[in-house]
Amino acid sequence: MVAVTLAGCGTTTYFAGRNLPPSGLVNRVMIAIQNPSAFSYGALEVVDAYYDTRFAYNNINQTFPVSGFSGDLPVTIQNMAEEQTGAVYNSGSGSLAMISYAKEAATGTQNGLNGDSSSIFITRDQEYIFAASQEEHVLTIVDRAKGGSYALSLPGIYRVSVNPGGTVALAFVQNSNYVYYPRQLTSSETLSYSGGPSTWPTSAVDCEPQNAPKWCLFQVADSNGTPLTFDRPLKAVFSTDGGTAYILNCGPECGGTASSASLLPTGPMIFRLGLASGALPSQSSMTNIPIPGGASNALVSSSTMYVVGQQPQTDGLYTGNLTVVNLANNTAGSPIGISDGSPGAPSRMILADDNTLWVAMTKCNNGERYAKGLPYGCLTMFNTSTNTVTLIEPYQGDATGIADVEGLHKIYAVEGGQVYIFSTKDGTAYDNQYVTVTGTAYDVAYIDAHSDSNNTVY
């Protein structure tokens, strides 16, 4: 990237008019680190992803910590590069810290969350936060624009998904076959539903506050109020036009029957005030794409959806698969073997240079590959032009983060609590000695990405 100084105002900018940050770096990867010292439980460090160093290229004593960050065991970075903002969830304190990429500084911690969150997202306009508060059995909604926080009861909730446009949120309950969505209420609905549960719509499972509700949580149901049945659903990804939600049915790897992807229109589930429209399908008319290789995570790219999951074997172990789905005709290809992983557990997926897709799994040493003496690393490099696996990287521990360093033909990855660098041309490992961290690395994000799609927390 080329930095440009604007004449007369002393401001230096680079890509898309972004101001040059205090570090002066234009290819930055931010690393979430747990227990970086005996006196700290968390830190965020910026490294130069062009030179692959944690210090300035001309001064080894100049490093780039994110100032003001005091998180406790950071585990995820929701990367919003277009907004020059990151949201870092800290599992030790149950807090969500907001990070300014332009200032390379923490800008505050979000209040109003209910205990720890097993899954949490903020909309890109930073107006709403949705969190699965599993221990408290509530879906927490923080309305940052209006200053309210709402706890909608949903026993067993453990995952939430939010669409890129920030208009639809879906909630999932562990070991359940149902899906839920929140919706903000109009003033007339608030009045109509203020008499308690007997005045709520048939598919509403909670409305809060009950004496004058502002939000209701609805079960996904047809126009007659009959709940739609899924198969251990745990996540949703969305079409590029935003009109369709692909519900991932985890199936056997989550204790269910058959893995698949179910298609729902997003219009009826829009949570923003007065924008919901249309109706959800009936059970018989809902499109369902069988994905026998497993379906616990997915990534949509134009008219293709890449789905990964774990498939049970006769010996009781699981093997990892990637399935390519053609969204133009809703057909799935044959499963392609990739890294094994923990059944139903979160995984990471990202597209990178040279037509590559990278998949990060955890507990890959407990799967079928390890048991049979096959390559069993947790990080898979997949070629999207040939739909083949290029390689499975050697085992270095759980893979918990990936970042695409756009245009430089490499990715950063976190494996076994340390940072590694791999070529997108052939998967070769680059020298990582100057980006390794003290403590336990847990996630990485390329914060100078061109778009918000360079993100594995979605």
Report each predicted region and the residues it spans.
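Predominantly soluble domains enriched in secretory-pathway, periplasmic, or organellar proteins
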Residues: 9-458
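Sec-dependent bacterial lipoprotein signal peptides
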Residues: 1-9
